[in-house]
């Protein structure tokens, strides 16, 4: 039985939730998100709360209910507060700049890298070695951050590359003769 699914999701003031079968739409100040929930989950809306439960006769329904509750909670937090992800570039000559709807990266390749940002994601560069991604969709921000990091993941000897701000890169010792 899922402890996560048992807790209801509170709907704050200014957030509008629409249930249409298994599709849930959350609209708030920062934007609008929509998601289709698994058929094994029963969603009920009571005033300013959403409750999740399992459908009878489905094997992993409690697990799916917990997952659905976490996803919907992230949607509610996203449209009220939003999410941010910070990336740090470490290395000689590694730079980032915003170019329209893309992030321009200089990462030691023979060519500059342009990463196009999807709709709903905003990027800013407080300095040449920092990228801050903001948006209301937690999953999309994480995916964009992972895509940017994949251009130059931090290497374990000198730590050069693109890392998350909260990431701790374990370093290795150099080979000894």
From Swiss-Prot:
Keywords: Ribonucleoprotein, Ribosomal protein, RNA-binding, rRNA-binding. InterPro entries: Ribosomal_uL6-like, Ribosomal_uL6-like_a/b-dom_sf, Ribosomal_uL6_a/b-dom, Ribosomal_uL6_bac-type, Ribosomal_uL6_CS. Gene3D superfamilies: Ribosomal protein L6, alpha-beta domain. NCBIfam families: L6_bact (TIGR03654). Signal peptide: none annotated. Belongs to the universal ribosomal protein uL6 family. Part of the 50S ribosomal subunit. This is Large ribosomal subunit protein uL6. SUPFAM superfamilies: Ribosomal protein L6. The gene is rplF. This protein binds to the 23S rRNA, and is important in its secondary structure. It is located near the subunit interface in the base of the L7/L12 stalk, and near the tRNA binding site of the peptidyltransferase center. The keyword RNA-binding applies. GO terms for biological process: cytoplasmic translation. PROSITE patterns: RIBOSOMAL_L6_1. GO terms for molecular function: rRNA binding; structural constituent of ribosome. GO terms for cellular component: cytosolic large ribosomal subunit. It comes from Vibrio vulnificus (strain YJ016).
